[in-house]
Curated annotation (Swiss-Prot):
The keyword Glycoprotein is assigned to this record: yes
Tissue specificity field: Is expressed primarily in epidermal cell of healthy plant, and following induction by ethylene, accumulates in mesophyll cells.
Catalytic activity field: Hydrolysis of (1->3)-beta-D-glucosidic linkages in (1->3)-beta-D-glucans
A GO cellular component annotation in the UniProt record: vacuole
Positions of the pro-segment in this chain: 349-370
Cellular compartment(s): Vacuole
Keywords associated with the record: Glycoprotein, Glycosidase, Hydrolase, Plant defense, Pyrrolidone carboxylic acid, Signal, Vacuole
Gene Ontology biological process: carbohydrate metabolic process; defense response
Official protein name in the record: Glucan endo-1,3-beta-glucosidase, basic vacuolar isoform GLB
Length: 370
């Protein structure tokens, strides 16, 4: 080895180490980017919008769901590079369905006025509208509202940037066991089939709220806690060649099967809500919530037996919201209203915060020895 090679050895080691650290960080962060967090605002003690968006950024949370086009939040999101699922609330669905002029106005005021400074990725038209719940009065308006918003987005020149969909829950699934036999309820097919057709034709994903907690708490005699928390040591459900060790995958794949049976085999799924309450009802404990959330973040990188690969997933919710009811709805937050984390979660960063000082100090130490 030449003299110059000897002198360059520490420097090369530092550069090599820095490169490895950056690659490791990039891999971890890339995996974590499957995860977003829902920003609910039903609390009287929550931080202001600017503080909230700074919290998202500091915790490396790269995706956010808004339930309505709150202009304060949208202003705070400008330049943040956070991808946004923007909600068109149920209260606006009938109005938007009634005419294109209303859809154009909504898109102009809530989308185009903020684009491209705010990275809006989806418009979620309505949340959990269903013919079998208290929102049944809106069912006939949902697909027309989606169509009008889609057309308005296209007219605004954003059709290649923003997908239009709706967020549904599991009440629309008639059969979910085994997952391969998943299907939409027969008495709801008149409602779901047009939605599936719209999503297929526009190449947009279905947004699905998936909560193993509610399945477990409603039927603890047949659904085990480990199966619900991603901690089952063995296969719980054998479905042909597919093996299920957690309820989240089983629920997700039952929706994929339902889509396929409805002519939507090409339609993807984004998990628009999932979480676990830390108090307020049976099974709602701090330990259970921490376990579920930690495992969900990890599992979102991997995919389900039917659809391997990262699952775009939004955790519900950013904060505990004290104006929600019933009691357990107040306890889904990742953070307390004072911005203190309730759990030690990793969004691709150390302890929930990407602490680059570890890499910087390690590199500086090597360079100082040159």
């Amino acid at each position: 080895m030449s003299t110059s090679d000897k002198h360059n050895t520490p420097q090369m080691a530092a550069i090599t180490l820095l490169g490895l650290l950056l690659v490791a960080s990039t891999i971890e962060i890339a995996g974590a980017q499957s995860i977003g967090v829902c920003y609910g605002m039903l609390g009287n003690n929550l931080p202001n919008h600017w503080e909230v968006i700074q919290l998202y950024k500091s915790r490396n949370i790269g995706r956010l769901r808004l339930y309505d086009p709150n202009h304060g939040a949208l202003q705070a999101l400008k330049g943040s590079n956070i991808e946004v699922m923007l909600g068109l609330p149920n209260s606006d669905v009938k109005h938007i369905a009634s005419g294109m002029e209303h859809a154009r106005w909504w898109v102009q005021k809530n989308v185009k006025d903020f684009w491209p400074d705010v990275k809006i990725k989806y418009i979620a038209v309505g949340n959990e509208i269903s013919p079998v719940t208290g929102t049944s009065y809106l069912t006939s308006f949902l697909t027309p509202a989606m169509v009008n918003i889609y057309k308005a987005i296209g007219e605004a020149g954003l059709g290649n940037n923003i997908k239009v969909s709706t967020s549904v829950d599991m009440t629309l699934i008639g059969n979910s066991y085994p997952p391969s036999q998943g299907s939409f309820r027969n008495d709801a097919r008149w409602f779901t089939d047009p939605i599936v057709g719209f999503l297929r034709d526009t190449r947009a994903p279905l947004l699905v709220n998936i909560y193993p907690y509610f399945s477990y708490s409603g039927n603890p005699g047949q659904i085990s806690l480990p199966y619900s928390l991603f901690t089952a040591p063995n296969v719980v459900v054998q479905d042909g060649s597919r093996q299920y060790r957690n309820l989240f995958d089983a629920m997700l794949d039952s929706v994929y099967a339902a889509l396929e049976r409805s002519g939507g085999a090409s339609v993807g799924i984004v998990v628009s809500e999932s979480g676990w309450p830390s108090a307020g009802a049976f099974g709602a404990t701090y330990d259970n919530a921490a376990t579920y959330l930690r495992n969900l973040i990890q599992h979102a990188k991997e995919g389900s037996p039917r659809k391997p690969g990262p699952i775009e997933t939004y955790i519900f919710a950013m904060f505990d919201e004290n104006n929600k009811n019933p009691e357990l709805e107040k306890h889904f937050g990742l953070f307390s209203p004072n911005k203190q984390p309730k759990y030690n979660l990793n969004f691709g960063v150390s302890g929930g915060v990407w602490d680059s000082s570890v890499e910087t100090n390690a590199t500086a130490s090597l360079i100082s020895e040159m």
